[in-house]
């Protein structure tokens, strides 16, 4: 039995293309892997705090006493990391906002990227500590950006996930959804076909 963690980050709720794709993924995964456990965390509906000058002090080793707000942030960070480590498949629904990922997803990454916990520095360089995972990124875009300099989502997510130890990463693209109904329908159809292939793999 595998455990699947689905991270949603779109601010558009039910109107979101990436949320629709993640919902489709969950449906298909449950159909093919009925014994598996699926956890869905919606980072837009239930946002995590923005890392600031106070909160960053909670995530770095220190003997200084923590403020109540820092204690809350550290507890949440511990919870998010434990959740991430407990799952085998990580599904990230990441729409493109202004060429990059949503703020809500970046805030999540800022709380799970902790030196000595999810990565560490060695004499040979950084080493990821979140290992043995498979990641699937479902990314929707209004325009066409794949394999062009305007796609900052793909390289950033590949880099971040690899940095914390997740190197088995597949991307599913739904592009051109703002180019009209016909293009949007085709983008969804192609993305769902790609999801079907990954779910069955």
Curated annotation (Swiss-Prot):
FMN binds at residues 10, 16-18, 96-99, 140-143. Gene3D superfamilies: 3.40.50.360. Its cofactor is FMN. It catalyses: 2 a quinone + NADH + H(+) = 2 a 1,4-benzosemiquinone + NAD(+); N,N-dimethyl-1,4-phenylenediamine + anthranilate + 2 NAD(+) = 2-(4-dimethylaminophenyl)diazenylbenzoate + 2 NADH + 2 H(+). SUPFAM superfamilies: Flavoproteins (SSF52218). Keywords: Flavoprotein, FMN, NAD, Oxidoreductase. It is an enzyme of class 1 (oxidoreductase). Binds 1 FMN per subunit. It comes from the Bacteria. InterPro entries: Flavodoxin_fold (IPR003680), Flavoprotein-like_sf (IPR029039), FMN-dep_NADH:Q_OxRdtase_AzoR1 (IPR050104), NADH:quinone_OxRdtase_FMN_depd (IPR023048). GO terms for molecular function: electron transfer activity; FMN binding; oxidoreductase activity, acting on NAD(P)H as acceptor; oxidoreductase activity, acting on NAD(P)H, quinone or similar compound as acceptor. It holds the Pfam family Flavodoxin_2. Disulfide bonds: none annotated. Its EC number is 1.6.5.-, 1.7.1.17. Belongs to the azoreductase type 1 family. Quinone reductase that provides resistance to thiol-specific stress caused by electrophilic quinones. Homodimer. PANTHER family: FMN-DEPENDENT NADH-AZOREDUCTASE 1, FMN-DEPENDENT NADH:QUINONE OXIDOREDUCTASE. This is FMN-dependent NADH:quinone oxidoreductase. The gene is azoR.
């Amino acid at each position: 039995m595998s455990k699947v963690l689905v991270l949603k980050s779109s601010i558009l709720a039910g109107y979101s293309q990436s949320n629709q794709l993640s919902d489709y993924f969950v449906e298909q995964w449950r159909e093919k892997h009925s014994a598996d456990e699926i956890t869905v965390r919606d980072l837009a509906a239930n946002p995590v705090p923005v890392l600031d000058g106070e909160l960053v002090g909670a995530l770095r080793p220190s003997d200084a006493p923590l403020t109540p707000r820092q204690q809350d942030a550290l507890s949440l960070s511990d919870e998010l990391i434990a959740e991430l480590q407990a799952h085998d498949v990580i599904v990230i629904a990441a729409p493109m906002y202004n060429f990059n990922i949503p703020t809500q997803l970046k805030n999540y990454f800022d709380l799970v990227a902790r030196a000595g916990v999810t990565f560490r520095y060695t004499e040979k360089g950084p080493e990821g500590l979140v290992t043995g995972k498979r990641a699937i990124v479902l990314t929707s875009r209004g325009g066409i950006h794949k394999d062009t300099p305007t796609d900052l989502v793909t390289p950033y997510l590949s880099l971040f996930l690899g940095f914390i130890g997740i190197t088995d990463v597949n991307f599913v693209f739904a592009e051109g959804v703002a180019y009209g109904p016909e293009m949007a329908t085709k983008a969804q159809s192609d993305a769902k076909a790609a999801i079907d292939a990954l779910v069955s793999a």
